[in-house]
Swiss-Prot record, chain A:
Catalytic activity, EC: 3.1.13.1
Protein localization: Cytoplasm
Name of this protein: DIS3-like exonuclease 1
PTM sites of type Phosphoserine: S989
Family annotation (InterPro entries): Dis3_CSD2, NA-bd_OB-fold, RNase_II/R, RNase_II/R_CS, RNR_Ribonuclease, Rrp44_CSD1, RRP44_S1
Chain ranges of the CSD1 domain: 236-310
Top-level taxonomy: Eukaryota, Metazoa, Chordata, Craniata, Vertebrata
Gene Ontology BP, a term: RNA catabolic process
Length: 1053, 244
């Protein structure tokens, strides 16, 4: 069946000799053509994705087009694209792995109508390369020949357009075969897609930047950077230990000078290096960009430099550890880049004045990326003036050794600078979050639920599922106004006297078939994104807010875990997993449940399900419910105690809280009161997650998705220990238990904030919890440090986390495996799952980052239009939590802002505080020691700032055109800020949520003034009003939010 | 950038799918002087096998075994067999090891107890090496032993298999071997399904072993059908020339 051919390759070896290599090449009579027009689909074995049936023509790009215009071909509007294998191989060999992977993902993506045709393995399509024929010519010839064959294969029913950049080919083949047209890419876009403006723009800008590059390479002026070493040399160097491989991580605050290389895998062990490697200056960085995998050569010890501990221009967080600036650290220079991490960048064009000063070459414009860590990018465009007030997305094309800055091209406009929508779009792009509305094809897969055509439980499902509608009292406890209820609880007494506890989770996988359009989309999103004022759902609202939401009083599909517990000891006797049908009886909110638990029945009027009933049945129902909640709480307490005993921890504000917070809706703007009911629900969810984790791991030891939380590195705790020592506390960080205990005892009765800050530092030192595939990790590493469980996963929120959907599928497969039924679900293999985990972890970090950035955006907008000098609310009380050489880091509890306050300004004047608390700038010097900083003026006056001192700060906004605005803090006085007592409670209730509300309102007002309808969802804001009073819990939550993000920032590198 | 050994569409570098063998061509009785001889091409791997015996023990008589025949195997590979010219054709460590492996394989297959105190020599030479040399040698030697008329339990059919991205690849070519993944060589007695020799290079998780083993065994059975055809054809030709 197969025909054998031979290919002769001549390769040049390192020594310069030519090596003749003979490779076999097998041809087969048929390869999948993936066309719906195929006359013999059985012979072609078209089992993958097919091209759309309704296209007017197929388009076959030449190798050069695929290499250069892949971005344009990625437009989903372009349909019926056939990539020839020859072209794909050209990309693989000449454009590198990154571009090739992009192409591969495009081919895999069900949303794009494109297929690969393996023409080189088809016996009629394959053309051997002739003697003396140039590679390029052969590739074009081969692609054309395949295009002709393909045309005839489809029985001449579908015209084919081959697009090429080769003029000769257009001449030669243009009219050779009827039905196969050969035209240039530009021509193709003009004729077939005249309306697709975005594609035209992109095409033009690619063309222009390429032309620029060509002319540039002809000019040979002096090289700005040393050339990168060839790949073979790098690989050999890494193996021999001469070079070190790592990920480049640019310091946000000194992006010009400082970058660090985080070591990668094994190389750190061999070289014996513990810390990161400093890359000092842009020369040494040698054209690598933040996030690239680079190869570094160490400099001799005499050239090592230290990092700076002084507060930089934009220093707002506290990442740099307390090393003194003089201490030199390993320093190196980049000699090569293994993998480029270029993505889309949001940039700002220079304003008019700046353009003129750039002078001689007006077409090339240096634009400033929004992200400080990215160097300026050179763009060739004529639209610079039109674009100056906008945030714009660009891509980097190349960075030659001869050019100081990288070359890029313009992709699209996001929105005006300073405009809320534009800035939010910026945050999304910078975090690579793409949240286009769900497409029609995706919505078509969704079930219908309209008043005329209500959704019903199907009889088939009724037979297969366990029916709990009549037997169990199922209810949900959520925050008020929550619409995506994905978990419910039940508890009842069995006939034998034992208790049965049930956790019922929305059965999302019933509606989301594996590899359906909606599944692919959800996988790409990986999570629901919560920004400060809005959210982007992972699933369409028909599922998330309706059919998958376990609302009260309606029949819903669920996946349940039910435990039989001993009536007295609450020992788990049996566990049952399976699909069920439930009808939630009550949709309670936390406060109401707590009231019921406390025996306060006046709340009954707030429960709609009970209100309508008459007195007597109301009483009976109420008793039943109160018993269930009480029992549940009791069980949860027991389970919790058991977990604590098992060497567990009571680590406030780490995973338990995250869990609790994660559990329902992280509209973190609705901070929860620390009620016991929270704990009860959280504990039940942890229990369910834990048991499901055990189950799927037992059934699929090598391909289960679990969640691990590695124990933290002891070194990271040093700052925490130092700080605690300043206040006279001792923190024992040897295990999670001792850490939790000593944190509990480290409590300053005078200042509760001290404890909160210490806790946030502890949180910061923790590693992040991560998803992983069990096949790629040793069993000891499964442990979850925060929860002190040996196995843990996420199972309880499939509506807003893709990981839970995967776990649901695994659980279903495990059940059918137990029943010896064939496994219907197609599960991920270990490798694919590992890749998916990486993607989800990555997306989660992006979600956290975008949440943090949007919060900061709102903070800035809140303070932006206020005059910091006069307005009263811009003055606030702050706590010093870290000391630097030229300033201190301050935390402002009232707004949850962390920031730097300088004690020495640009003119080298230091701060001095008068006796009555006012401050001014005077010449003088600063003196820093372990836990205090002394500012001495020339006149001999001195002020001392200790760690954990309260100071009064003024908040203002430092506006920035190219980047996000930042909050600036200024110390007004070294005394705590006293709010007049009468205002205290009122004042302190101003939380992030209020702030967001206010900003959105002002934006809306502005928009209304322009008669533009505000897009912000009003109802969301109603909920923010619920927050009353400031609890320590919420405060802690806020610190934690920021703290966790800082850590993840560094992990994301 | 490493080569993509298995594309997303399921093709290997040379256009085969995961379980497909390379083209096999073989001939028996290529030399008249020897008792048995055979030549095989598996893809671009070419091997020549010659068998002498059973005959009296040559050299020191003390090597003679009282109850069965001594199988003596020698492997060599031509200096021009690889891309870069080799220094010495045989006697190096690798050749010796290969000789031992062949000996082990054929001791298991030949009914040695029928010829006590005698010796069977098998000489194998690889003319072109393009992956799977052990398999090619075994297959060639099987044919040569049959050509010599030495009784065997069954054919010995060998094939290699590798493991890439969760998929087992049968009959590795040189490019695939050089990529450095796990590689398994299997010599099978196809009728009984017994394994004459199993060898594994580099690490492979035990969970995947079964899959790779099955792929190799399947390929070996495929080799068997082909060799069987060759033998039948040869016998037919021989009988025609004898004039029966």
């Amino acid at each position: 069946m197969l025909q054998k051919r031979e290919k002769v390759l001549l390769l040049r070896t390192f020594q310069g000799r030519t090596l003749r290599i003979v490779r076999e090449h097998y041809l087969r009579p048929s390869v999948p053509c993936n066309s719906p027009l195929c006359p013999q689909p059985a012979a072609c074995r078209n089992d993958g994705k097919l091209l759309a049936a309704e296209v007017t023509h197929y388009v076959i790009p030449d190798w050069k087009v695929v290499q250069d215009y892949l971005e344009v071909l990625e437009f989903p509007e372009l349909k019926g694209v056939i990539f020839m294998q020859t072209a794909c191989q050209a990309v693989q060999h000449q454009r590198g792995r990154r571009q090739y992977n992009k192409l591969r993902n495009l081919l895999k993506d069900a949303r794009h109508d494109c297929v690969l045709f393996a023409n080189e393995f088809q016996q009629h399509c394959y053309l051997p390369r002739e003697k003396g024929e140039a590679m390029e010519k052969w590739q074009t010839r081969s692609i054309y020949n395949s295009a002709v064959w393909y045309y005839h294969h489809c029985e001449d029913r579908m015209p084919i357009v081959m697009v090429t950049e080769d003029e000769e080919a257009i001449q030669k083949y243009g009219s050779e075969t009827e039905g196969v047209f050969v035209i240039s890419f530009k021509n193709y876009l003009d004729n077939f897609w005249p309306d697709l403006k975005a594609a035209h723009d992109l095409c033009d800008s690619i063309l222009q930047s390429r032309r620029e590059r060509e002319t540039e390479s002809q000019e040979t002026h002096g090289k700005e950077y040393p050339e990168h070493l060839p790949l073979e040399v790098l690989e050999a160097g890494i193996k021999s230990g001469r070079y070190i491989q790592g990920i480049l991580n640019v310091n946000k605050h000194r992006a010009q000078i400082e970058a660090f290389v985080r070591l990668h895998g094994a190389s750190s062990k061999d070289s014996g290096l513990v810390s990161d490697i400093l890359i000092h200056g842009s020369k040494a960085r040698n054209r690598s960009i933040h996030g690239d995998v680079v190869v570094v050569e160490m400099l001799p010890k005499s050239e090592w430099k230290g990092r700076t501990a002084a507060l930089g221009e934009n220093d707002s967080d506290d990442k740099a550890s307390g090393e003194s600036p003089s201490e030199p650290m390993p320093t190196g220079r980049v000699v090569g880049i293994l993998q480029k991490n270029w993505r889309d960048y949001v940039v700002t064009f220079p304003s008019k004045e700046e353009v003129q000063s750039q002078g001689k070459n007006a077409q090339k414009i240096l634009v400033t990326p929004w992200d400080y860590r990215i160097p300026k990018i050179r763009i060739s465009t004529q639209q610079a003036e039109a674009l100056q007030d906008f945030r714009v997305v660009v891509r980097i094309d190349s960075w030659e050794a001869t050019s100081v800055y990288p070359n890029g091209h313009f992709v699209r406009v996001l929105g005006r600078i300073g405009d809320l929508e534009g800035e939010i779009a910026t945050i999304l792009v910078e975090n690579s979050i793409s949240v286009v509305p769900f497409s029609e094809a995706q919505m078509c897969e969704m079930p219908v639920n309209t008043p005329e055509n209500p959704w019903k439980v199907s009889p088939k499902e009724e037979q297969e599922r366990k029916d709990l509608r009549t037997t169990h009292l199922v209810f949900s406890i959520d925050p008020k106004g929550c619409e995506d209820v994905d978990d419910t609880l039940s508890v009842r007494t069995l006939n034998n006297g034992n208790l049965e506890l049930g956790v019922h989770i929305a059965d999302v996988t019933h509606f989301v078939a594996p590899n359906s359009y909606i599944d692919v989309e959800a996988r790409t999103r990986a999570t629901t994104y919560y920004l400060a004022d809005r959210r982007y759902d992972m699933l369409p609202s028909i599922l998330s807010a309706d059919l998958c939401s376990l609302l009260g009083g309606v029949d819903r599909y669920a996946v349940s875990v039910m435990w039989e517990l001993d009536k007295t000891s609450y020992e788990i006797k049996k566990v049952w997993y399976g699909r069920t049908i439930i009808r939630s009886a009550y949709k309670l909110f936390y406060e109401a449940a707590q009231e019921l638990l406390d025996g306060n029945f006046s709340i009954v009027d707030d429960i709609p399900e009970l209100k309508a009933l008459d007195k007597q049945s109301q009483q009976a129902k109420l008793e039943e419910l109160v018993w269930a909640i009480g029992k549940l709480t009791d069980i949860a307490r027991h389970i919790r105690a058991k977990r604590d005993r098992c060497g567990a921890l009571e680590l406030e504000g780490v995973e338990v809280r995250v869990q609790l917070d994660d559990k329902k809706n992280i509209r973190d703007l609705i901070p929860k009161q620390p009620l016991e009911v929270h704990e009860t629900v959280a504990e039940c969810m942890i229990l369910a997650n834990h048991w499901v984790a055990k189950k799927i791991w037992e059934s699929f030891p090598h391909q289960a998705l679990l969640r691990q939380h590695p124990p933290p590195h002891q070194e990271f705790f040093s700052e925490l220990r130092e700080c605690a020592k300043a206040k006279g506390f001792f923190i024992d960080t040897r295990s999670n238990k001792t850490l939790a205990d000593s944190l509990d005892s480290a409590n300053d009765p005078k200042d509760p904030l001290v404890n909160k800050l210490l806790r946030s530092m502890a949180t910061q030192a923790m590693s992040n919890a991560l998803y992983f595939s069990t096949g790629s990790c040793a069993e000891e590493e499964f442990h979850h440090y925060g929860l002190a469980l040996d196995k843990y996963t996420h199972f309880t929120s499939p509506i807003r986390r893709y990981s839970d959907i995967v776990v649901h599928r695994l659980l279903m497969a495990a059940i059918s495996k137990d029943k010896k039924m064939e496994i219907k679900e197609n599960l991920f293999s270990n490798k694919n799952l590992e890749e998916l985990c990486r993607h989800i972890n990555n997306r989660n970090r992006a979600a956290q980052r975008s949440q943090k950035q949007s919060t900061e955006l709102f903070q800035c907008m809140y303070f932006k239009d206020r005059d910091a000098e006069t307005e009263e609310r811009c003055i606030a009380d702050g706590v010093i939590y870290s000391i630097r050489t030229n300033g201190v880091l301050v935390f402002i509890p009232r707004f949850g802002i962390k920031g730097a306050a300088y004690l020495k300004n640009k003119d080298s004047l230091v701060i001095s505080c008068g006796p009555e608390g006012s401050s001014e700038w005077k010449p003088g010097s600063l003196q820093r020691s372990q836990n205090k900083i002394i500012s001495t003026t020339a006149g001999g006056q001195s002020v001392t700032f200790h760690l954990f001192d309260h100071v009064t700060v003024r908040i203002s906004v430092q506006a920035s055109r190219c980047h996000s605005d930042t909050i600036r803090l200024e110390i007004v006085s070294n005394k705590p800020y006293m709010i007049p007592n009468t205002e205290l409670c009122h004042q302190s209730s101003l939380l992030k949520s209020e702030l967001v509300k206010e900003v959105t309102r002002s934006v809306e007002e502005a928009q209304l003034a322009q008669e533009v309808k505000g897009k912000v969802i009003q109802e969301e804001h109603q909920e923010y009003c619920q927050t009353k009073g400031r609890s320590l819990y919420t405060l802690l939550e806020e610190i934690r939010d920021l703290a966790l993000l800082d850590v993840s920032d560094s992990c994301a590198m | 950038a490493g080569l993509e050994l298995l594309s997303d569409q399921g093709y290997r570098i040379d256009g085969r799918r995961a379980g497909e063998l390379r083209k096999i061509q073989a001939r028996m009785g290529v030399f008249a002087q020897a008792d048995g001889s055979a030549y095989i091409e598996q893809g671009n791997t070419k091997a020549l096998a010659v068998v002498y015996g059973p005959h009296e023990i040559r050299g020191s008589r003390s090597r003679a075994l009282p109850d069965r025949a001594l199988v003596n195997c020698q492997y060599s590979s031509a200096t021009f067999s690889t891309g870069e010219r080799k220094r010495r054709p045989h006697g190096d460590r690798k050749s010796c090891e290969m000789g031992l492996q062949l000996r082990q394989t054929f001791e298991a297959a030949i009914l040695t107890q029928l010829h006590p105190r005698s010796q069977i020599d098998i000489y194998v030479q690889v003319l072109q090496a393009d992956g799977g040399t052990y398999a090619a040698c075994v297959n060639a030697a099987t044919l040569a032993v049959m050509d010599a008329g030495i009784p065997m339990r069954d054919f010995v059919c060998a094939c290699s298999a590798g493991f890439v991205d969760g998929t087992a690849l049968a009959d590795l070519s040189h490019v695939e071997e050089a990529a450095g993944g796990p590689q398994l060589a299997l010599a099978l007695l196809p009728a009984s399904g017994q394994i004459a020799l199993l060898e594994m290079d580099s690490r492979l998780h035990e969970d995947h072993l079964e899959q790779v083993l099955e792929a190799a065994a399947q390929a070996a059975r495929g080799v068997h059908t082909l060799l069987d055809l060759v033998v039948r054809q040869h016998v037919q030709e021989a009988s025609v020339s004898l004039g029966d």
